[in-house]
């Protein structure tokens, strides 16, 4: 019998892009840790950072106000752990035909979840809910009724919806698995 997954964590700094991926986009800088270049869309500026500091959000995957401090961080760690050797194999052999069905499944899960786990996805969901609540308010629906209709927590926090959708990726996984896959590579002179 399998042991139930412990969904509690003390991890505060949580990456929206796993470090093992970020390290592939970084280079050692003389006398310093590895660096990569990032672009802040909101501020419109590029800057250098490290894989440890890039794409970090504090307690981003934690369920707020949960009595047992549940978090999706441990589950995301499992997906990363499963996909990391598959991605390493692709980088080493540069041949997507080597993927087994199990490898393809692990990679499809990882890609589907990766698409859904970003801060941008949270903002997209928040924006969509804001538009919907405005439309409902224009039709005379109270804020409480709108929140109930949209499945919002009493405080109207869209993060609960974001966290729920993060683990509901079955249709996206199936969609990815139904596609033909190709491996593309860029060169350092033309990244």
Go through each PLM region and give its residues.
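Alpha-helical structural context detector biased toward long hydrophobic helices
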Residues: 1-191
């Amino acid at each position: 019998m399998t042991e139930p997954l412990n969904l509690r964590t003390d991890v505060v700094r949580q990456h929206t892009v796993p470090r093992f991926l970020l390290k592939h986009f970084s280079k050692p800088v003389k006398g310093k840790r590895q660096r990569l270049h990032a672009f802040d869309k909101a501020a419109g500026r590029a800057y250098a950072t490290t894989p440890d500091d890039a794409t970090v959000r504090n307690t981003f995957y934690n369920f707020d106000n949960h009595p047992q401090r549940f978090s999706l961080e441990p589950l995301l760690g499992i997906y990363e752990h499963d996909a990391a050797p598959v991605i390493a194999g692709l980088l080493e052999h540069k041949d997507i035909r080597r993927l087994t069905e199990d490898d393809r499944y692990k990679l499809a899960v990882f890609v589907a979840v990766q698409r859904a786990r970003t801060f941008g996805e949270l903002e997209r969901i928040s924006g969509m809910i804001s538009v919907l609540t405005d439309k409902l308010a224009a039709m005379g629906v109270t804020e409480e009724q709108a929140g109930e209709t949209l499945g919002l927590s009493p405080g109207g926090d869209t993060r609960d919806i974001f966290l729920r959708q993060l683990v509901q990726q079955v249709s996206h996984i199936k969609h990815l698995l139904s596609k033909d896959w190709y491996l593309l590579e860029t060169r350092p002179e033309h990244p």
